[in-house]
Amino acid sequence: MSRGGVVRFIPTEAKFFELFAELSGYLTEGAKLLRGILEDPYDLDMRVEQVQAIEHKGDRATHAIITKLNQSFITPFDREDIHKLASSLDDVLDFTNAAANRLVMYKITQPPPAASELAGLIVLQCEELAQGVSLLEKNGAVMKHCEEVNRLEDEADHVSRRAIASLFDGEKDPIKLIKLKELFEVLEVATDKAEDAANVLEAIVLKSA
C-alpha cells in the first residue's frame, strides 16, 4: 500500500486527487482574496461576494468528493480519511468566508493591520495544504508541509492574542471592540481549521507508512 511513508494509489482512483487539488486551490484563492480586502478594503460588498463565490465552488468540490466516495468501491486511502480531509479543507474555506462576511455585516471599513497579518498567515497555510495534498498523489514529502501549517497556526495564536489585548487596551467604543474582537476570533478559527486539515493529512501518511 505504501513505500517511504507515502500513499500508493490505483490509477483509476486519480479523480479523488484531482478533486482534492481543486478544493485546496479554492482555499488559497479565497484566502488571497480575503487578505487583499483586509489590506485595502475598497468595494467591500463586491469583493466579499467574490469570496462567497469561491466558498460556493469549494462546497461543490467537497460534495463531488463525497459523491465520488459513495460511488467508489476502491479508494486511494481510508474512506473515513477521505471524508475527513474533504470536510476539514472545506472548513478552512467556510471560516475564510465567514471572516469576509463580518466585514460587511459589521461595516468594518478600516480593519486593524493585525487582521491582514492573520489573513496572510491563512494564505501561507492554504498554500502549504495545497502542496501537501498534491504530494499525496505524487508520493512526495507531505509531512514537512503539515508541520509548517502547524507552525503557522502557533504564530497566528500569538498575533491574535496580541491584537485582542491591544483592542482592550486602546479601543474606547465598546461596540467596535466587540466587532473587531469577533473578526480576530473568526480569523484565528480559520487558522485552527487549517491545522486540523494538516493533522488529517498527517494521519493519512502515518497510516500508509
Which stretches of residues belong to each language-model region?
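Cytosolic, long alpha-helical scaffolding segments
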Residues: 1-209
